[in-house]
Regions:
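Non-heme iron-sulfur electron-transfer modules
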Residues: 207-212, 251-298
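Secreted/processed peptides and extracellular or luminal domains of membrane proteins
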Residues: 101, 145, 241-247, 251, ...
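Flexible loop/turn segments at secondary-structure boundaries
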Residues: 30-33, 133, 244, 252-255, ...
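Iron-sulfur-associated redox domains of electron-transfer enzymes in respiratory
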Residues: 1-218, 248, 310-311
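Single conserved hydrophobic/aromatic residue that forms the stacking wall/gate
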Residues: 310-322
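Long, well-ordered mid-to-C-terminal structural blocks that present hydrophobic/aromatic surfaces
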Residues: 211-262
Length: 322
């Protein structure tokens, strides 16, 4: 276990960014999101949650896959280069890290998504425990411990000092790279901090919500429940919930005519859109109620049954936009 004074964090960021890209919570125009670090960036590690999740670091909102070029009768295809430079995502919360685990199940299963895999291979995650969870938090319901995040490095901000604990080979490598800035620390304060955070979580109003009834048994009763006809009505079909969600991974693949060829690119899509996965045989979900129901059934029933992992990890962010 190590620690570093808060006033020395700028030096820590400089040290990390000297060798690799560094992304962390940065405030821009009154909004905090994960962005590339710079000397004049307003870093906000005390922000409980960013507007968007940091999943962009591993699954970008838009990315080129390959480019087709035509010169007279000759056609060439240039694949997009995979991620080669190492990078660090600093300050991720336990719920967002759980979101990455969900993405891993999707993109690292056969057939492996090489673009995603390259970013995971080159990315190091530094987690930051939630010092004071909000009233709307209920990560405990999904088995997430916000007091003890599991990543390459786990950190806790306690009384003006950042406590630092490497947990993986990547974490050990990063720790070695910044060792001159770290001091040895006793784990006692961290254990006290964990206990204090968990005590807060236990008192939160939604911490004891139950997922009973959302399993495989009787799922058709849930599917056919008349309650969906009421629940979907406030939905604007804007898709914002899917874009800020750390676990949503739906995407579309499109072609863009550059004038000199065609770029094929991948971009996020949303199951809440009326034209989502428009198929030739016409088997689309025609109503917003059906799309709304599919989103929740996918996260709470279909995905857990198939992959033994709940497809929700950060409900508080979704509540803040509703």
């Amino acid at each position: 276990m190590y620690k570093i004074a808060a006033e020395n964090l700028q030096a820590l960021f400089q040290k990390i960014a000297a060798d690799q890209d560094l992304y962390l919570p940065v405030k821009v125009s009154d909004q905090v999101n994960f962005k590339a670090w710079s000397e004049d960036a307003e870093v906000c590690l005390d922000t409980l949650k960013t507007v968007k999740s940091p999943k962009d670091a591993f699954f970008p909102q838009s990315e080129n896959l390959y480019t087709c070029k035509k010169e007279e009768k000759n056609i060439s295809i240039e694949p997009q280069a995979l991620q080669e430079k190492n990078f660090v995502v600093f300050g991720m919360k336990a719920c967002d890290i759980q979101g990455v685990k969900v993405l891993d199940n999707v993109f690292l299963s056969d057939p492996i998504d090489t673009f995603y895999a390259a970013r995971r291979d080159h990315g190091t995650i530094v987690a930051l425990a939630c010092h004071e969870p909000e009233e709307s938090c209920f990560c405990k319901v999904f088995g997430i411990d916000c007091a003890d995040p599991v990543a390459d490095v786990a950190t806790w901000m306690i009384e003006g000092e950042l406590y630092w604990k490497p947990l993986t080979e990547k974490g050990e490598a990063l720790t070695k790279a910044v060792a001159e800035l770290l001091n040895d620390a006793d784990e006692a304060k961290v254990e006290e901090e964990k206990a204090a955070i968990r005590a807060i979580v236990e008192k939160l109003p939604y911490s004891n919500l139950s997922l009973e009834g959302w399993g495989q048994e009787d799922y058709m009763d849930r599917f056919n429940s008349p309650v969906w006809e009421e629940l979907y009505k406030p939905c604007l079909a804007c898709g914002t919930c899917t874009f800020v969600c750390p676990t949503c991974q739906c995407y579309d693949i499109k072609d863009y005519d550059t004038g000199h060829g065609v770029q094929r690119y991948r971009c996020w899509d949303s199951c809440m859109y009326s034209d989502f996965t428009m198929m030739a045989h016409g088997n689309n979900r025609n109503s917003q109620m059906q799309r709304f129901r599919q989103r929740f059934m996918h996260k709470l029933v279909y995905y857990p049954v198939n992959l033994s992992l709940i497809h929700i990890s950060e409900p508080t962010r979704l509540l803040s936009i509703s």
